[in-house]
Swiss-Prot record:
Name the UniProt record assigns to this protein: Alkaline phosphatase 3
Encoding gene, per UniProt annotation: phoB
InterPro entries: Alkaline_phosphatase (IPR001952), Alkaline_phosphatase_AS (IPR018299), Alkaline_phosphatase_core_sf (IPR017850)
Active site, renumbered: 101 (phosphoserine intermediate)
One Pfam family of this chain: Alk_phosphatase
Residues reported in the UniProt entry to bind Mg(2+): 52, 154, 275
PANTHER family tied to this protein: ALKALINE PHOSPHATASE
Amino acid sequence: MKKFPKKLLPIAVLSSIAFSSLASGSVPEASAQEKKKGNQDEIKNVIVLIGDGMGVSYTSAYRYLKDNKKTKVVEPTAFDQYLVGQQTTYPDDPEQNVTDSAAAATAMSAGIKTYNNAIAVDNDGSEAKTVLEAAKEKGKATGLVATSEITHATPASFGSHDHSRKNMNSIADDYFDEMVNGKHKIDVLLGGGKSNFDRKDRNLIKEFKKAGYSYVDDRKDMLKNKDSQVLGLFADGGLPKKIDRTKDIPSLKDMTNTAIKKLNKDKDGFFLMVEGSQIDWAGHDNDIVGAMSEMEDFEQAYKAAIDFAKKDKHTLVVATADHSTGGYSIGADGIYNWFSEPIKAAKRTPDFMAEKIADGADVEKTLKTYIDQKKLALTKAEIQSVEEAAKSKEVLDIDNAIENIFNKRSHTGWTTGGHTGEDVPVYAYGPSSETFAGQIDNTEIAKNVFKALQYNIKINDK
């Protein structure tokens, strides 16, 4: 394995560029042409991408994971070129000062601090206007894309209002019932959460179809659909992680490109929020395999947004995280190494393998089927640890045992199964990208997007 010290100079250079950006309030320049596009052209479209749980340790580990071992340098990821700063994430909660996804998303959608669990409402329970609603008021097309349920905390905080993120059925109702200028306020909805739309008390899928929306539930139908308004639900709950996904379930890149293609038909432009939801879920699970799988899914969607913006020349792209998750560390137990090869050996997530074993599959056969033995040759002790966990027949016990193998072999550390409160990176490209530079607060994401939309609003951010 190549040692990191041989390859750190380019990363240091990138970091120094980013640091100078923070100090000066400027954005790293890819070229004079891109600078012209970023600073002089009017904004027609805004794309906000949120890597849920994606702290700096995740973006750093992903860089090392994707590194080309044949070179002497650590190659940058798609994110690195457009790093402009970092943001604080704390909520305005009477009992907690580490944010959840709802409070953080509300900060980024509405520009206000609020309590954990709040969906675009303030501490008094009053609804706060979101940037998606502002875009719709300006006549733009709007969309939400996520790998979680589309009613989960982050997308919900852009497209609905509720005192609790747990009310996912009510959030689904809001997506249909709440109008802006007499129109449904979200034109494209792509993600999971079918169970929140197809219920005994209400069938929102039928209602959306009656209102003129297309409905799709697999990748093939989504890609061939020609309509500008579409509801796409590809799982009852969240989508499988990228590494576990079958061909009939779209990737985050697929959904992002589909949303952009449909929304871009609107002559007045569009607003789109895209969430890589399950970076966070993997972090909660202390699952490094799942985390890196979801980082790749998110990077590909991010690249799709950037590629569109470069061609369009009137699109602002902002990418960030709502918080970090798991207290993830690159290196653990006092060992000064971190190895990506064990992670690359996985063909499926520990969750996937654990469910197979809990259903009665042979432990050793399952592990060796879904873990490349050339990259990670399992020891007898490692196999026995999973066999011991399997005696309980509990998926969680088996999952933890398999995750422990990957964590130990890669020297990955975790401190919690919850969120952590550090600042998170901010990336931006296109017109007004410089407004996101430096040390900012997460509420400034929304405030700057409102400005980009030329929407005048007085935000009560007491």
